[in-house]
A protein has these predicted regions:
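Short linear motifs embedded in intrinsically disordered, charge-biased segments
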Residues: 1-322
């Protein structure tokens, strides 16, 4: 199956593997538009070239009726940001920006309103902010840095809703428990697994299923560190949710069984992640307490005051000279 165009409402995206093939598609598309009395807006039409790994980038030159189209590094299609490099860095920043903007617009009418219960505010947050933040996350291939950025924004919003200040010294695990939310990692992996099961149940002729289970006919992966693939992310999610990667397709064939496996796996993964975070926090606290207990300190010879650092002792000695 060769995919040449992606159509949705009045949006159209053309795909080609070579520059001359793309120019041919654009010429054919422009001719078809003329036959139906349509006009292509060259100011809204952009070109993006994604070279294969190891191949130098060159700016494409695509024209419509003699007018060259603007080449861009990234563009937005159906709400998602597509970049020239195979990374979701810009998409994650875009998601955080849109969710932050939505959170700010609701501050006066929802978050700061005393007449609205906290439970209702959390439902609004889940329906508006969280869906904006994780829009199209089913198709992401996230790295840990992306999940950390999303999780930090998630916790900032929950602390603001629950009126928890940083001076209260309440850990993130307790904030999530009070709000009744899971971590961003669990939410993203849960969405990916649900989407994977939906694709697995599609007929074999459907394009999403062919893309998920297909293999490249040409080319090979470079030597050394490899870029993370969607299949790699999906396999990690299955292992985290205690789902066998070898037999997941049989489980996903039955929708109710697959949903139950995902829900149970999410609870297990969240409990393990919570226990690990609590254990790390206790270890960090114990190391700090033991270091403070065994530290010799710096004693003032004048009054016997103990200072934690030498610079503190020097500053304190100045008070005796005045």
């Amino acid at each position: 199956t060769v995919i040449r165009d992606l159509l949705f409402a009045d949006d159209c995206a053309l795909n080609a593997s070579r520059e001359q093939d793309m120019q041919h598609l654009v010429d054919r598309f422009a001719a078809a538009c003329d036959n139906f009395g349509l006009t292509i807006s060259t100011t809204k039409t952009e070109v993006m070239h994604q070279p294969a790994p190891g191949i130098p980038y060159h700016e494409p030159c695509i024209t419509v009726k003699g007018q060259q189209l603007r080449a861009v590094e990234n563009f937005t299609y159906l709400g998602s940001n597509l970049a020239r490099t195979p990374s979701i860095d810009i998409e994650v920043q875009n998601r955080i920006s849109k969710a932050s903007s939505a959170f700010g617009r609701l501050r006066e009418r929802v978050w700061d309103r005393r007449g609205i219960r906290t439970k209702t505010k959390l439902k609004v947050y889940s329906a508006v902010i969280l869906t904006t933040l994780l829009y199209a996350c089913e198709t992401w291939t996230p790295y840990r840095r992306h999940l950390r950025q999303l999780h930090s924004f998630h916790l900032r919003c929950l602390r603001a809703l629950l009126h928890i200040r940083w001076q209260d010294r309440i850990p993130d695990t307790e904030v999530l428990q009070r709000a009744g939310f899971s971590t961003i990692t669990t939410l993203v992996r849960k969405a990916q697994l649900r989407w994977a099961g939906h694709v697995a149940r599609m007929p074999d002729h459907r394009i999403p299923k062919q893309l998920l289970f297909g293999e490249l006919a040409e080319g090979k992966r470079s030597v050394g560190g490899q870029k993370k693939r969607f299949k790699d992310s999906l396999k990690t999610s299955m292992k985290d949710f205690k789902i066998n990667p070898e037999s997941w397709e049989q489980c996903a064939a039955e929708r109710s069984t697959w949903r139950s496996a995902i829900s149970q796996g999410a609870l297990t993964a969240e409990d393990q992640r919570l226990a690990h975070a609590i254990h790390k926090r206790l270890e960090r606290k114990s190391r700090g307490a033991s270091a403070q207990h065994t530290a010799p300190g710096f004693i003032c010879p004048e009054c016997g005051k103990s200072c934690r650092a030498r610079i503190g002792l020097i500053s304190h000695l100045r008070s005796h000279k005045t």
